[in-house]
Amino acid sequence: MIVRLGAAGVVYAVVVDTAYFTGNYPQACSVEGARVDGYGDVASAAEWEPLVPRSPLTGDARHVFQVSSDRRCTHVRLRIYPDGGVARLRVHGTVVPSPSLLEGLTFDLAALENGADVVACSDRFYSSPRNMLSPGLSRVMGEGWETRRRREPGNEWLVVRLAGASVVSLAEIDTSGYIGNSPGAASLLGCSDPAALEDPSAWFPLLPRTALLPDAPHRFRLSDARPVTHVRLDVFPDGGVARLRLHGSLTEAGLAEVRRRWVETGG
C-alpha cells in the first residue's frame, strides 16, 4: 500500500495498529519512504528507502517503530507479510515545506502544513493545541483547542513557532463551535529571538487584549511590522479556539532558513 503524505517532511515514527485483528493480522510488516516532486507517477518515479525494516507484528496491538532517517519523504509504502488486516497506519514527522511555494507570497505562517508547530501550552486537558493549526475548518469542538475551566488566577496561553522568521499582517481567531465555553478575550504577543522565549521582556504586543464573540470567526489587521519567529496567544480566562491563522510573509532570514532545511533533507 502506498500513501501520499499530507505534507512533505522527515518521518520520526510509524505506528502500525492491528486493533481487533486477532486471527487475521499480518505476521510482519516493513515501511519504506520516497520523495517524489510534483504529482508524477509514484510507482515509476519513486526511489524507495527503508524506514522500518521487516518487523514482527502481533494481533490486536499497537506497534510503534522509531525512524532514524533524516531524509524528506512525500510518500510511504507499507508492506505486510504475507497478508492480513491493519486497523490504522500513522506516520509522525516534522513538516518541511518547499521554499518555492512560500517565497514572495502571503500565507498562513501558523499552519502545520507550512512547518509551524505549538512549542508550549498552559493546558491541553480536552484536546491538543495543535488542532488549531490544522487545515480546513473545525467541524466540532474536539477539532479545536479546548481548555478546562480555570479556577486559579491567570489565563490560558500557547506559543506557536511560525514557519520561519516573518512579518505577520493579519490574525484570525475562530471560536466556531464554542458557545458556552469560548474565551471572553484574547491577545497576541510576538518574539523575534527563539533563544529568549522564557524572557518576558523579549515579547512585544501584536494584538492588545480584545473581546471575542462565541461561535464566530474574528479577523484583526496587525500594524507592528517587526519580524517574529514565535507568537503567543493568550485567552482570557480560558475556553476554546477552533482555529488560529496568522497571515504574513517570510523575511529574507526566514526564507533562507526554509531553504536550508529543504536542502539538508534532500534538496
Cite the ranges covered by each PLM segment.
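Disordered, acidic Ser/Thr/Pro-rich linker "stalks" and the adjacent N-terminal cap
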Residues: 1-4, 94-163, 179-181, 250-267
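A short beta-strand element within beta-rich, extracytoplasmic domains
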Residues: 9-20, 78, 167-178, 233
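Predominantly extracellular/luminal cell-surface or secreted proteins
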Residues: 17, 32-36, 92, 174, ...
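Short, surface-exposed beta-strand/strand-loop-strand elements in extracellular ectodomains
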Residues: 22-37, 181-194
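Acidic Ser/Thr/Pro-rich low-complexity disordered segments
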Residues: 37-49, 103-108, 194-204, 262
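Beta-sandwich interaction modules
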Residues: 48-85, 155, 162, 166, ...
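Short, structured interface segments
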Residues: 86-97, 246
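Eukaryotic modular interaction domains in large regulatory/scaffold proteins
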Residues: 141-172, 177, 195-197, 202-218
